[in-house]
């Protein structure tokens, strides 16, 4: 009897898929579903807190827009609102919906046929000139903004990596070394350095601070975004931490630094390679390679 029941259920599902399509799911208590999804992201998927929060917000926005209805059409309608956004933004929404619908709700059929947008590779991006970088830097109004700008440009680190740095544990001020602890399933930590230009403004900024907070850069999100708005307006092109990361990679290559070392600086090398350079002679060798390149932003 049970086998016959299971067979009937499978046959019914196949009929729905071949005729009217899969049945939609409907949720009246949106906040309850979102809360359980957030817990699923943190516990079951072991996502970073930032990613789990982003996915939670994506699920909430989607459910509010669709009035709690989860169907192939409601997903398409939601994604349609992001067609004019950057490909990376669209893909982030799609990834969040896949986590929510395909994995959390176990309804992968509702996401069928939805593809990621093409994201331009690094070589497709416009790279700022030295003159544009100088104009961007000169448009910044205080020592904190200037220190942050130069830190991104001379370390090549990811946006989130810099904002998480602990000034007491992650920075070797004597060597001007940065040991990022950023390590996720998709992104690795890196070992990098900052140059003398950055050192000047970084020390001025840290000496001006009266707090003892661990964060290397104590700044809110809105003031942080204003840095890049001012820099972009002055440069005549969009300047962001990601653009500076790409500029760093390109500039180091042109200065003769082998790709394998640029990968270490930017956290793209395997953990076994990073471990060899984390202390002692390995770290000193990395510093010699970085210093020999003579990376400059303002000169």
Task: Name what the model sees in each region.
Residues 119-135, 185-197, 211-217:
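DNA breakage-rejoining catalytic core of tyrosine-based enzymes
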Residues 170-173, 238, 257-277, 299:
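Short, polar N-cap/turn motifs at the start of nucleic acid-interacting alpha helices
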Residues 221, 237-256, 264:
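Short basic/aromatic active-site micro-motif
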Residues 1-4, 8-24, 35-124, 212, ...:
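N-terminal core-binding DNA-recognition domain of tyrosine recombinases/integrases
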Residues 127, 266-298:
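Catalytic-site neighborhood detector that most strongly recognizes the C-terminal catalytic loop/helix
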Residues 121-122, 130-159, 245:
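Basic, Lys/Arg- and aromatic-enriched nucleic-acid-binding interface segment
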Residues 155, 164-204:
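Conserved tyrosine-mediated DNA breakage-rejoining catalytic core shared by Y-recombinases
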Residues 195-238, 248:
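Active-site/catalytic core of tyrosine-dependent DNA strand-transfer enzymes
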């Amino acid at each position: 009897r049970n086998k016959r029941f299971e067979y009937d259920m499978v046959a019914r599902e196949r009929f729905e898929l071949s005729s009217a399509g899969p049945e939609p799911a409907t949720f009246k208590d949106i906040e309850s579903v979102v809360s359980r999804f957030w817990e699923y992201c943190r516990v079951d998927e072991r996502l970073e807190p930032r990613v789990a929060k982003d996915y939670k917000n994506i699920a909430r926005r989607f459910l509010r827009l669709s009035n709690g209805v989860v169907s192939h059409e409601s997903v398409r309608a939601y994604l349609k609102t992001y067609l004019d956004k950057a490909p990376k933004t669209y893909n982030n929404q799609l990834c969040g919906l896949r986590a929510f619908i395909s994995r959390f709700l176990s309804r992968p059929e509702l996401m069928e046929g939805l593809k990621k947008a093409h994201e331009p590779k690094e070589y497709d991006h416009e790279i700022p000139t030295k003159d544009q970088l100088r104009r961007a830097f000169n448009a910044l109004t205080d020592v904190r903004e200037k220190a942050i700008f130069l830190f991104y440009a001379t370390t090549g680190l990811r946006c989130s990596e810099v904002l998480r740095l602990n000034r007491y544990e992650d920075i070797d001020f004597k060597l001007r070394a940065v040991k990022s602890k950023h390590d996720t399933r998709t992104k690795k930590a890196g070992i990098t350095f900052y140059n003398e230009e950055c050192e000047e403004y970084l020390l001025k900024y840290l000496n001006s601070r009266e707090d003892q907070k661990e964060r290397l850069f104590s700044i809110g999100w809105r003031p942080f975004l204003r840095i890049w708005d001012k820099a972009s307006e002055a440069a005549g092109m969009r300047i962001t931490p990601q653009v500076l990361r790409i500029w760093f990679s390109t500039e180091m290559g042109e200065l003769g630094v082998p790709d394998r070392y640029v990968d270490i600086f930017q956290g793209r090398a395997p953990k076994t390679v990073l471990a060899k350079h984390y202390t002692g002679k390995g770290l000193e060798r990395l510093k010699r390679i970085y210093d020999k390149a003579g990376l400059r932003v303002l000169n």
